Amino acid sequence: MRILVEIAYQGNNFLGFQIQQNGRTVQQQFEKLLQRMHKRHVRIHPSSRTDRGVHAIQQYFHFDTELNIPMSQWQYAMNRTLPDDIYVNNVVTVDDDFHCRYDCVGKRYRYKVYQAQHRDPFQSGLKTFIPETLDLDKMNRAAQQFIGTHDFTGFCSQKTEVESKVRTLYQSEIVKTDDGFDYIVTGSGFLYNMVRVLVAFLIEVGKGRHEISDVPKLLESKNRKNVPFTAPAEGLYLEKIYLDENELLKDFGNDIKIHRKKSLQND
């Protein structure tokens, strides 16, 4: 039986989602829990592999089990032993050919920034602090230049090893908040550090160090040295996973192209 689990977690005290040799990760927490339940190793397969310090409001993984536990009991059984910085929101059965990564058709990230004269210790690890005044309207117009299908070689980590760095963004916008702004971006998939590099670039736009007209040139250059900064992980949230292409079409229109993850990596 294949089971799909929806979870949320605060990333401050994790080295990321994926198993690490010597460190606390989200995958490690769940595989330890499942091993205790099954008396054997059980591998989980996530929709996304978030980095160190990145949070998730909605994340999924699947695993296979032979245990005869009522579906209504899985959530309780997991949450009663998980640490406080992880929570299981839902557990359902899925078809045996379902794959959490390959059946993912889109993801939405939100990057949270607060602006103030002084750093707020109660925001530490949850939002990124920027004291400078920024031109949010200009940043939003620059952000919208990324909507569509582009080669994001110049806007991802140089450690990115995937062959194709072409991704499609359906949404890219700056939204003003009471204490700063959020950057919201939805796409077919994302390269290593891509969202954080986009945020860092947009902040430079807001400071007047880049122009809106620079976006097409930087995309065309495919040179990360032209966009050298990366925003901190602490403000980044994996907000939504699209497993249903009809939901994605409803949100962004029937004319968008659906991308399957069998050809996309590093997400």
Curated annotation (Swiss-Prot):
InterPro entries assigned to the protein according to its UniProt record, in alphabetical order: PsdUridine_synth_cat_dom_sf, PsdUridine_synth_TruA, PsdUridine_synth_TruA_a/b_dom, PsdUridine_synth_TruA_C, TruA/RsuA/RluB/E/F_N
Catalytic reactions on record: uridine(38/39/40) in tRNA = pseudouridine(38/39/40) in tRNA
SUPFAM superfamilies for this protein: Pseudouridine synthase
Superkingdom: Bacteria
Enzyme Commission number(s) from the entry: 5.4.99.12
Keyword annotations: Isomerase, tRNA processing
GO MF term set: RNA binding; tRNA pseudouridine(38-40) synthase activity
Subunit structure: Homodimer.
Protein name per Swiss-Prot or TrEMBL: tRNA pseudouridine synthase A
Gene source species: Staphylococcus aureus (strain JH9)
Gene: truA
